[in-house]
Amino acid sequence: GGSVPCGESCVFIPCITSLAGCSCKNKVCYYD
């Protein structure tokens, strides 16, 4: 539930890792 960081930030651009199931949360990409 968004507790595992994906090692990507989403301050300026969306999460590229969203293709792998990650989502932006608090300017950092987390895996759902």
Curated annotation (Swiss-Prot):
Keyword Disulfide bond attributed: yes
Positions of crosslink type Cyclopeptide (Gly-Asp): G1-D32
Signal peptide bounds: none
Cystine crosslinks: C6-C22, C10-C24, C15-C29
BP terms from Gene Ontology: defense response
Domain observations: The presence of a 'disulfide through disulfide knot' structurally defines this protein as a knottin.
Family: Belongs to the cyclotide family. Bracelet subfamily.
Name assigned to this protein: Parigidin-br1
Annotated organism of origin: Palicourea rigida
